[in-house]
A protein has these predicted regions:
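Elongated, mostly alpha-helical coiled-coil "stalk/stator" tethers of large membrane protein machines
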Residues: 32-153
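Long, amphipathic coiled-coil
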Residues: 1-40, 44, 48-55
Length: 153
């Protein structure tokens, strides 16, 4: 009887030790997967950022800014509009102001990294965001949801 109790005790202890070891291994593996996922995501979106930076040097990009300004002018329909651009895009200020009209003001924005424009109607406080930064952020969220890189419990 004593032998049986000892055997049961040792069996339970070994099972507990094994369960603990398995849990530690699963936790370590989950962390490694999370780190790999983050690294892969960073590489993908760093490459996308480089591609966007090259795009902003093209005529297509300046045409896109003009198109955005036209959409904003139409959406804000004669409002008191302030456009926000990154420093590198301030060279387009006069062209964009001419499109939006009505005393449109252009302001440099430090939080626009990749390009595009953001607008605000200074009277109604309505906002429009057509920045490449926001589009990239939305794509990153989509990528994380649909890439199959989710980590299941």
């Amino acid at each position: 009887d004593r032998y049986k109790s000892y055997t049961e005790y040792e069996t339970a202890r070994i099972k507990a030790d094994c369960n603990s070891a398995v849990s530690e291994c699963e936790e370590r593996s989950r962390k490694e997967l999370t780190d790999l996922r983050a690294e892969l995501c960073k590489k993908v979106f760093d490459a996308a950022g480089e591609t966007i930076n090259e795009y902003t040097k093209t005529d297509s990009y300046s045409e896109k800014l003009v198109s955005s300004a036209k959409e904003i002018a139409e959406a804000f329909d004669g409002g008191d509009v302030e456009l926000f651009l990154r420093k590198e895009d301030l060279v387009f200020s006069d062209d964009l102001k001419a499109i939006v009209k009505n005393g449109c003001v252009v302001t440099e924005s430090d939080d626009i990294v990749y390009g595009g424009l953001r607008a605000a109607d200074r009277k109604t406080h309505c906002l429009a965001d057509d920045t490449l930064d926001t589009k990239l952020k939305e794509q990153k969220e989509w990528f994380l949801e649909h890439s199959g890189l989710s980590i299941e419990e």
